[in-house]
Amino acid sequence: EIMDEETALWAMFLLAINPWHIMMSRWGLESNLAPGMLLFGLYFFLRGSESRRFYFLSALMYGLALYSYAVVWMYVPIILLLGVWYLIREGRLTPKSRSLWGSAVIVAVFAAPLVLVLLVNYGYIGEIQTRFFSIPKLDFLRTSQTNGYTFWQNAENLAGILFLQSDGLIWNSPTKYGLYYSFGILFIMIGLAASIHSFCRKWKRREYAPEFFLLLQFLCGLFLGLTSHVNVNRVNIIFLPMLIMGGYGIEIFCSFCAHILPRWTKWVSVGAACLYLVSFLCFAQYYFTEYRQESAAAFDSGLKDALAEGEKSGKTIHINKSGIYPKVLYYVQMPVDEYINTRVFSDWHPMPKSAGNLYFDMEQAEPDRNGVFILEEGADLSAFVQEGFEVEKYGSCSYVYYSE
C-alpha cells in the first residue's frame, strides 16, 4: 500500500529473519503486541481509500493498540489525527464522512476506560464500582514515573539502540548480531533517505504520498526515544517502519547497481538475499545454543523448581532477586486475599518486602536455619556453606537450605 511489490517482498523477507522480530515473537512480553497492532491499524487505514469499511477495522486495531502498551497512548491520537488530516488534504477523505465519524466513535469507546483510569488515579474523580466493571484507585501508577535524563542523554541512548543495535539488556538484543544485523542499518538509512526524498517531491507536486504514514510512525518512535530514556521494547514502535525502509533500501541499492552494472542485476539481488540468509543461519545457531545459556539468568531459569522445593520445606522462603515478585506469586499460586492481607511494602514500591511466607530481599539475607534461600547466579554462598547449609542448583538459581 505504501511501496511497490518488490519492496514489500524484501520487507517481508527481512521481517521473517530479523533478530529483533524473532526475539520479540518468542518472548511473550505484552508490550510487544504494540508494533503488530499499529501495523494492522495502518494497513486498514490505507485500505480505507479503496473501501470505507476498512476504516472501521483500522479503528478497531488502533483501539486495541491502546491496551497493548501505555507508551502508545500519546502516539495513537497523533498518528490518527495527522493521518486523517493528510487524507482530507489530499481529497481522499471528507470531514463529513460517516465512516470517519463512525471510526472515531469506535476509538473513543476503546479509549474511554483508559481516560477514566487516569482520572481516578490522578484524583480527579473517585473510584468507580458498577455491576459490570470497576476502576479502583491503584497503589502505584507507572505513568507517574519520570526518567530524570536530559535530552542529550536520551539522544545518546537512542543512537546506541538504533546504530549500535543494543540497549545492553541481554533479553532485548543479542550482542553478537544486533537487532537487524550489523550491515542492515546501511539499507535502512538508504530507505529512510529515499522515503523522505520521495515524500518531499510528491508534496511539492501536490501528489498523494503514502510514505507520509510510514515516516509519521517512524518520527513518533524517534520523538519517544528523544523525550524519555528507552530500551528496545519501550521504543518498539519504531522498528517495523525501519524494516520496511530497509526493504526499500535494498530495492534502491539493487536498482542502482542494475543501472551501472546491467549484466549483474540478478546477481546483486541474489547476493543481498544470501548475505541476509547466511547472517540469519549464524544468528539461529547462536540463538538456540550460546544465547540460551547467556540469557538463562535473565529469564530466571530454574526459579519454578526452586520454589517448589521451598514450598515442600514449609519454611520461610527468601528470594534475593529484585523485580521478579509477580513471577514468584504466579509460580506459588498465592491466593489474592492472602497476598492483600499479608503483604508488606518495601521502599521500592510497589514491590513487596514480604507476602505470606515469602520474603523479597533487596540485599542477600543472613543465614537462618528456619528459612530456605533462593539466590541468583553469582551470589556469594560462602556464609551459608560455613554454617553447614546445603546448596542445590536449579538452572541459574541456587536453592540453599539447612538439613536437620
Locations of regions flagged by a protein language model:
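Membrane-interface transmembrane helices that cradle and orient dolichyl/undecaprenyl
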Residues: 3, 38-57, 65
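Short helix- or helix-capping micro-motifs
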Residues: 11-16, 62, 66
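Short acidic/glycine- and proline-prone juxtamembrane loop motifs at membrane-interface regions
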Residues: 20, 26-31
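Hydrophobic/aromatic-rich transmembrane helices and adjacent perimembrane loops
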Residues: 24-25, 74, 185, 208-257
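Transmembrane-embedded, aromatic-rich helix segments that form part
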Residues: 35, 56-62, 71-89
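Transmembrane-lumen/periplasm boundary regions of multi-pass, lipid-linked membrane glycan transferases
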Residues: 75-190, 328
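Membrane-proximal, lumen/periplasm-facing interface regions of secretory-pathway glyco-
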Residues: 265-311, 321-336, 340-352, 356
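Luminal/periplasmic acceptor-recognition loop/helix of membrane-associated glycosyltransferases
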Residues: 309-323, 331-404
